Amino acid sequence: MAEANEMASAFEAVLKTGDFGKVQELALTHAADDFVQEWPQSGERLTKAASVRIAEQYSEKSGTSPKFSYKRMLGGGDLFVVEGTIDYGDGIPVSYVGIGELRDGKVTKMTEYFANPFEAPAWRANFVERM
C-alpha cells in the first residue's frame, strides 16, 4: 500500500504542473506490462506499446500540446480517479475523468472520458443551479 501511496503522490505532483507530456511519461513508467488504456467515447482500446507510440507522436500528429488542469485525485486500494480539464490549445476546457486500476503497484487499466462543454437545455433551467 505504501508503494501505491508514493505513486499517487508522484502523479498528483506531476498533474499539478499541467504538463500533459510529463503526465503521459509518468503514467507509462508506472504501467504494468499488460497495461490497457480505454477511450470509450471514441471506441478505442490501446496496449502499453500503442500508448507509448501515441504519446511520442501526439503533438506532431495532432498539432497541439495539451495542458492539463488538475482538480482532484481520489482513491484507495487498487482504484483511483483523476478529475480535471484539458485545454487542447483552443481555450475550450474539455472535462476529463480517468479511472485507474492497480495491481502490485502498477497501473493495469486506465479508462478515460473526455467531454466538450455544451449549452444546457433551457427546459432544465428551473431544476438546476448553474455552475
For each feature predicted by the language model, list its residue ranges.
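A beta-strand edge to alpha-helix "cap/lid" segment located at domain peripheries
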Residues: 3, 53-131
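A solvent-exposed, acidic/Ser-Thr-rich amphipathic alpha-helical stretch
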Residues: 24-76
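Short, flexible micro-motifs
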Residues: 21, 46, 108
